[in-house]
């Protein structure tokens, strides 16, 4: 029976991973490692769940928290393209924090690491080039924001660490998973968009081109892919060692606006008029200045305007081929759960 650790386990994705691990037959103990205290800690009658408050940049505390762990699912990150955090803060957590986790793996002889990367480790790039493809599609990877850069660098770090020698001469095996736009209950961004629509009289004003298609994925299926990858990476001859996979399910691929309308229309949200691009650009520039001068974050800035209007569509089944992944939540269930959460959080 194994001991798993989930960094960022009190977060949006991490909590769902912990919930699914409770049903994993080969897991005896789950260590939930997060810098914040979980206000609603998950409990179980069949698994030992230990919550450890810890900064992943503090090597000594990380080492202590991970001592005796067999496998790490590393989800801890600062996900920010809105200006809430400084560039240094994002790099410290996303890149250097991952360095700390890898160092602990080497020092403690932890053989398996599943890393939560991001689609932004690939794109959309700073040129606004569309991406339609899979894990092996050629694309100009040129990050346009420090968040994307930090996830790209951390993914490369984790991939390079695969097959490296750790304590007692054993080998470390790693795998990276790249979620596209995650949605589901607990998604703060979806909640913000919903609240904005309510404030505007149940109207969603459109800001994104209809042909800017983005792949989306439900949080429960992303969590399931992590749990499944954690199982398969331990098999001798596993195909996933040293590989990266996009996270996907059967959620609609469409523009951000159209996706939100599909999700929220049963909640009474109606389509509004399209805001002209010149006006969006003007507000984006204004918000960028506020961020620079006053550290004021904003959902609309030049970076978010560009990436939301740049197609990033994943077409792959590599996770199915290599570790037998298939979504465990269909779209109807995913939408129903998300809508219920939005209604209850009003």
UniProtKB/Swiss-Prot annotation:
<keyword id="KW-0945">Host-virus interaction</keyword>
<dbReference type="InterPro" id="IPR050177">
    <property type="entry name" value="Lipid_A_modif_metabolic_enz"/>
</dbReference>
<feature type="binding site">
    <location>
        <position position="151"/>
    </location>
    <ligand>
        <name>NAD(+)</name>
    </ligand>
</feature>
<keyword id="KW-0244">Early protein</keyword>
<comment type="pathway">
    <text>Lipid metabolism; steroid biosynthesis.</text>
</comment>
<dbReference type="InterPro" id="IPR036291">
    <property type="entry name" value="NAD(P)-bd_dom_sf"/>
</dbReference>
<comment type="function">
    <text>Catalyzes the oxidative conversion of Delta(5)-ene-3-beta-hydroxy steroid, and the oxidative conversion of ketosteroids. The 3-beta-HSD enzymatic system plays a crucial role in the biosynthesis of all classes of hormonal steroids. During viral infection, steroid production contributes to virulence by inhibiting the host inflammatory response.</text>
</comment>
<keyword id="KW-0899">Viral immunoevasion</keyword>
<keyword id="KW-0560">Oxidoreductase</keyword>
<protein>
    <recommendedName>
        <fullName>3 beta-hydroxysteroid dehydrogenase/Delta 5--&gt;4-isomerase</fullName>
        <ecNumber>1.1.1.145</ecNumber>
        <ecNumber>5.3.3.1</ecNumber>
    </recommendedName>
</protein>
<feature type="active site" description="Proton acceptor">
    <location>
        <position position="147"/>
    </location>
</feature>
<comment type="similarity">
    <text>Belongs to the 3-beta-HSD family.</text>
</comment>
<dbReference type="Pfam" id="PF01073">
    <property type="entry name" value="3Beta_HSD"/>
</dbReference>
<keyword id="KW-0511">Multifunctional enzyme</keyword>
<dbReference type="GO" id="GO:0003854">
    <property type="term" value="F:3-beta-hydroxy-Delta5-steroid dehydrogenase (NAD+) activity"/>
</dbReference>
<keyword id="KW-0413">Isomerase</keyword>
<keyword id="KW-0755">Steroidogenesis</keyword>
<dbReference type="GO" id="GO:0004769">
    <property type="term" value="F:steroid Delta-isomerase activity"/>
</dbReference>
<keyword id="KW-0520">NAD</keyword>
<dbReference type="InterPro" id="IPR002225">
    <property type="entry name" value="3Beta_OHSteriod_DH/Estase"/>
</dbReference>
<dbReference type="GO" id="GO:0006694">
    <property type="term" value="P:steroid biosynthetic process"/>
</dbReference>
């Amino acid at each position: 029976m194994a001991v798993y650790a989930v960094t960022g386990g009190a977060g949006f994705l991490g909590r769902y991973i912990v919930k699914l691990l409770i049903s994993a037959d080969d897991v005896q103990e789950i260590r939930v490692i997060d810098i914040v205290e979980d206000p609603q800690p998950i409990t179980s009658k069949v698994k030992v769940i230990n919550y450890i408050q810890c900064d992943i940049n503090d090597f000594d505390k990380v080492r202590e928290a991970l001592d005796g762990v067999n496998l790490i699912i590393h989800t801890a990150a600062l996900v920010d393209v809105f200006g809430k955090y400084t560039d240094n803060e994002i790099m410290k957590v996303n890149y250097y924090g991952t360095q700390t986790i890898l160092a602990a793996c080497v020092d403690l002889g932890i053989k398996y690491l599943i890393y939560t990367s991001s689609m932004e480790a690939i794109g959309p790039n700073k040129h606004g080039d569309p991406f339609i493809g899979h894990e092996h599609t050629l694309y100009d990877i040129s990050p346009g924001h420090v968040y994307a850069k930090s996830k790209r660098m951390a993914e490369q770090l984790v991939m390079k660490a695969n097959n490296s020698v750790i304590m007692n001469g054993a080998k470390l095996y790693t795998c990276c998973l790249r979620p596209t736009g995650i949605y589901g209950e607990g998604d703060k961004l979806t909640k913000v968009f919903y609240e904005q629509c309510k404030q505007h009289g149940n109207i969603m004003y459109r800001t994104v081109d209809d042909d800017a298609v983005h792949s989306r994925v439900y949080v429960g299926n992303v969590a399931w892919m992590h749990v499944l990858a954690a199982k398969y990476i331990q098999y001798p001859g596993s195909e996933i060692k040293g590989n990266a996979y996009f996270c996907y399910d059967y959620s609609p691929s469409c523009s951000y606006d159209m996706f939100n309308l599909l999700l929220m229309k049963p909640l009474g949200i109606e389509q509004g008029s399209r805001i002209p691009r010149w006006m969006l650009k003007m507000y984006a520039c204004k918000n960028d200045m506020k961020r620079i001068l006053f550290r004021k974050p904003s959902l609309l800035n030049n970076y978010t305007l560009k990436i939301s209007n740049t197609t990033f569509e994943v077409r792959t089944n590599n996770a199915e081929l290599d570790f037998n992944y298939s979504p465990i939540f269909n779209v109807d269930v995913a939408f129903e759960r998300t809508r219920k959460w939005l209604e209850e959080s009003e």
